Amino acid sequence: MAVKIRLTRMGSKKKPFYRINVADSRSPRDGRFIETVGTYNPLVAENQVTLKEDRILEWLGNGAQPSDTVRNILSKEGVLKKFHDSKYSK
Protein backbone atom coordinates (compact mmCIF):
# COMPACT_ATOMS: atom_id res chain seq x y z
CA MET A 1 0.00 0.00 0.00
CA ALA A 2 1.59 3.27 -1.16
CA VAL A 3 0.78 6.04 1.31
CA LYS A 4 0.74 9.74 0.40
CA ILE A 5 0.44 12.91 2.46
CA ARG A 6 -1.79 15.20 0.42
CA LEU A 7 -4.43 17.93 0.50
CA THR A 8 -8.17 17.30 0.74
CA ARG A 9 -10.37 20.20 -0.32
CA MET A 10 -13.00 21.44 2.11
CA GLY A 11 -14.91 24.71 2.37
CA SER A 12 -17.42 26.14 -0.06
CA LYS A 13 -17.35 27.35 -3.64
CA LYS A 14 -14.65 30.02 -4.22
CA LYS A 15 -13.53 29.70 -0.56
CA PRO A 16 -11.26 26.66 -0.36
CA PHE A 17 -9.87 25.27 2.86
CA TYR A 18 -7.64 22.21 2.89
CA ARG A 19 -6.95 19.39 5.31
CA ILE A 20 -3.57 17.70 5.14
CA ASN A 21 -4.38 13.99 5.16
CA VAL A 22 -2.49 10.73 5.03
CA ALA A 23 -4.20 8.50 2.47
CA ASP A 24 -3.67 5.49 0.25
CA SER A 25 -2.46 6.74 -3.13
CA ARG A 26 -5.28 4.86 -4.91
CA SER A 27 -8.03 6.72 -2.99
CA PRO A 28 -9.69 9.73 -4.66
CA ARG A 29 -8.70 13.25 -3.62
CA ASP A 30 -11.65 13.78 -1.29
CA GLY A 31 -12.17 10.08 -0.55
CA ARG A 32 -11.00 7.74 2.20
CA PHE A 33 -8.04 8.74 4.29
CA ILE A 34 -6.09 7.22 7.16
CA GLU A 35 -5.40 10.25 9.36
CA THR A 36 -5.66 14.06 9.34
CA VAL A 37 -2.31 15.61 10.25
CA GLY A 38 -2.94 19.31 9.62
CA THR A 39 -4.85 22.10 7.91
CA TYR A 40 -4.03 24.77 5.34
CA ASN A 41 -6.01 27.95 4.67
CA PRO A 42 -4.70 29.84 1.61
CA LEU A 43 -7.18 32.72 1.88
CA VAL A 44 -5.81 34.46 4.98
CA ALA A 45 -2.92 36.87 4.60
CA GLU A 46 -0.14 34.64 5.94
CA ASN A 47 -1.55 31.31 4.67
CA GLN A 48 -2.54 29.81 8.02
CA VAL A 49 -1.08 26.34 8.54
CA THR A 50 -1.50 23.98 11.50
CA LEU A 51 0.47 20.75 11.64
CA LYS A 52 0.84 17.73 13.92
CA GLU A 53 4.61 17.59 13.45
CA ASP A 54 5.17 14.43 15.48
CA ARG A 55 2.63 12.47 13.42
CA ILE A 56 3.97 13.85 10.12
CA LEU A 57 7.53 12.88 11.08
CA GLU A 58 6.33 9.40 12.01
CA TRP A 59 4.52 8.94 8.67
CA LEU A 60 7.54 10.24 6.73
CA GLY A 61 9.72 7.81 8.67
CA ASN A 62 7.39 4.98 7.67
CA GLY A 63 7.76 5.87 3.99
CA ALA A 64 4.79 8.16 3.22
CA GLN A 65 5.43 10.41 0.22
CA PRO A 66 4.20 14.04 0.38
CA SER A 67 2.58 15.58 -2.69
CA ASP A 68 4.36 18.54 -4.31
CA THR A 69 2.18 21.15 -2.58
CA VAL A 70 2.42 19.45 0.80
CA ARG A 71 6.20 19.16 0.36
CA ASN A 72 6.37 22.94 -0.17
CA ILE A 73 4.22 23.58 2.92
CA LEU A 74 6.33 21.25 5.06
CA SER A 75 9.53 22.90 3.81
CA LYS A 76 8.29 26.38 4.72
CA GLU A 77 7.29 25.16 8.19
CA GLY A 78 10.67 23.45 8.74
CA VAL A 79 9.30 19.92 9.13
CA LEU A 80 11.32 18.43 6.27
CA LYS A 81 14.53 19.85 7.74
CA LYS A 82 13.74 18.17 11.08
CA PHE A 83 13.05 14.91 9.25
CA HIS A 84 16.28 15.16 7.28
CA ASP A 85 18.31 15.97 10.40
CA SER A 86 16.80 13.10 12.38
CA LYS A 87 17.29 10.66 9.52
CA TYR A 88 20.93 11.49 8.79
CA SER A 89 22.30 12.50 12.21
CA LYS A 90 24.65 9.94 13.73
From Swiss-Prot:
The keyword Membrane appears for this protein: no
GO annotation, cellular component aspect: cytoplasm; small ribosomal subunit
Superkingdom: Bacteria
GO biological process, one term: translation
Residue ranges crossing the lipid bilayer per the database entry: none
Matching HAMAP family: Ribosomal_bS16
PANTHER family, A to Z: 30S RIBOSOMAL PROTEIN S16, SMALL RIBOSOMAL SUBUNIT PROTEIN BS16M
Name of the protein described by the UniProt record: Small ribosomal subunit protein bS16
Species whose genome carries this gene: Streptococcus sanguinis (strain SK36)
